[in-house]
Amino acid sequence: MDWTWRILFLVAAATGAHSQVQLVQSGAEVKKPGASVKVSCKASGYTFTSYAMHWVRQAPGQRLEWMGWINAGNGNTKYSQKFQGRVTITRDTSASTAYMELSSLRSEDTAVYYCAR
């Protein structure tokens, strides 16, 4: 295990030790090229509107890749240049849920997608 993974583990362990924050994502999906996918992330254990929600992905054999984030309070968004025009991040404050929609899917979009507070 290299130092970067140790740091990530320690941060995750410290966060989990002091809270009951939970982020529950929708399940796996299979899509055809050119289609769109919308992933949900339901938050609990904290005030949803007080934090930003980030979306990252990890393709097979690749590093984590940041896609964008949303300010859950005011709805402002910022996207990675790489995904600009294809990704849309939204939120429903009444349901404490964030959404990430990726359009014009291609084979290179095969990945595990994560939300992160």
Swiss-Prot record:
One of its GO terms (biological process) is immunoglobulin mediated immune response. Residues 116-117 are annotated as: Complementarity-determining-3. GO terms for molecular function: antigen binding. The keyword Membrane applies. SUPFAM superfamilies: Immunoglobulin. PROSITE patterns: IG_LIKE (PS50835). Residues 20-44 are annotated as: Framework-1. Residues 20-117 form the Ig-like domain. Its main location: secreted. Residues 78-115 are annotated as: Framework-3. Pfam families: V-set (PF07686). InterPro entries: Ig-like_dom, Ig-like_dom_sf, Ig-like_fold, Ig_V-set, IgHV. Residues 45-52 are annotated as: Complementarity-determining-1. Residues 70-77 are annotated as: Complementarity-determining-2. Residues 1-19 form the signal peptide. Keywords: Adaptive immunity, Cell membrane, Disulfide bond, Immunity, Immunoglobulin, Immunoglobulin domain, Membrane, Secreted, Signal. GO terms for cellular component: extracellular region; immunoglobulin complex; plasma membrane. SMART domains: IGv. Residues 53-69 are annotated as: Framework-2. The keyword Acyltransferase does not apply. Immunoglobulins are composed of two identical heavy chains and two identical light chains; disulfide-linked. V region of the variable domain of immunoglobulin heavy chains that participates in the antigen recognition. Immunoglobulins, also known as antibodies, are membrane-bound or secreted glycoproteins produced by B lymphocytes. In the recognition phase of humoral immunity, the membrane-bound immunoglobulins serve as receptors which, upon binding of a specific antigen, trigger the clonal expansion and differentiation of B lymphocytes into immunoglobulins-secreting plasma cells. This is Immunoglobulin heavy variable 1-3. It comes from Homo sapiens. The gene is IGHV1-3.
